Curated annotation (Swiss-Prot):
Organism for this UniProt entry: Sus scrofa (Pig)
Alphabetical keyword list: DNA-binding, Homeobox, Nucleus
Tissue and organ distribution: Exclusively expressed in the developing pituitary gland.
Lineage: Eukaryota, Metazoa, Chordata, Craniata, Vertebrata
Annotated protein name in UniProt: Homeobox protein prophet of Pit-1
Function of the molecule: Possibly involved in the ontogenesis of pituitary gonadotropes, as well as somatotropes, lactotropes and caudomedial thyrotropes.
SMART domains associated with the record: HOX (SM00389)
Compartments it resides in: Nucleus
Disordered: annotated span: 1-77, 175-226
Keyword Nucleus: yes
GO terms under cellular component: nucleus; transcription regulator complex
Family: Belongs to the paired homeobox family.
Length: 226
């Protein structure tokens, strides 16, 4: 038992540094371990939650987050805007010579004028899209309500009557040709009085009038009366 106790006393205990390894003049092992524990221990804020090591300012040797570079905004006077707008109305894509001329007139740099024209073109495209967007869902039938109706014609033109069809008279072919005499010519209309009653003609179609009688022409030369 005594031998085992001596062995345990001779063995270095875990968690402790053997004092024989440190030369004289160095602090004690317990003090060194305490310092190491403090350096590895995370920083704690007032609430007790570990917040990690505090970030140092750029002056302390560590870089912080890069600050966003602020853009310099150019302020245009009303006279400058008027000149730029008039030039934009004439030409939306001016060349280098036109921009340099505007720079001399307005007192601005050529680069500022180029940026202004780019922004102005983008603004115009945005305005055009905003105007066309409400009309995109409308159907073509909807546009018919916006169109004005054609004015009514104040004059009314009569419709032309249907064409009349002439039917040949049946007696023109049935009766043989007879010499034209006064008696037969006078009885001819009487014999045709019953035809319309027996054969009514359709509406809009009237029989052709009979051909006029052909009178014999005398080919003898006229006699001179002396």
């Amino acid at each position: 038992m005594e031998a085992e106790g001596r062995r345990e006393q001779g063995k270095p205990r875990k968690g402790r540094v053997c004092s024989s390894l440190w030369p004289e003049g160095y602090p004690a092992a317990g003090t060194l371990t305490a310092r190491v524990d403090i350096s590895t221990r995370p920083y704690r804020n007032l609430s007790g939650v570990g917040a990690g090591r505090p970030r140092l300012s750029p002056q302390g040797g560590q870089r912080g987050r890069p600050h966003s570079r602020r853009r310099h905004r150019t302020t245009f006077s009303p006279a400058q805007l008027e000149q730029l707008e008039s030039a934009f109305g004439r030409n939306q894509y001016p060349d280098i010579w036109a921009r340099e001329g505007l720079a001399r007139d307005t007192g601005l740099s050529e680069a500022r004028i180029q940026v202004w024209f780019q922004n102005r073109r983008a603004k115009q495209r945005k305005q055009e899209r905003s105007l066309l967007q409400p009309l995109a869902h409308l159907s073509p039938a909807t546009f018919s309500g916006f169109l004005p109706e054609p004015p009514a014609c104040p004059y009314s033109y009569p419709t032309p009557p249907p064409p009349m069809t002439c039917f040949p008279h049946p007696y023109n072919h049935a009766l043989p040709s007879q010499p034209s005499t006064g008696g037969s010519f006078a009885r001819h209309p009487q014999s045709e009085d019953w035809y319309p009653t027996l054969h009514p003609t359709p509406t809009g179609h009237l029989p052709c009038p009979p051909a006029p009688p052909v009178l014999p022409l005398s080919l003898e030369p006229p006699k001179s009366w002396n």
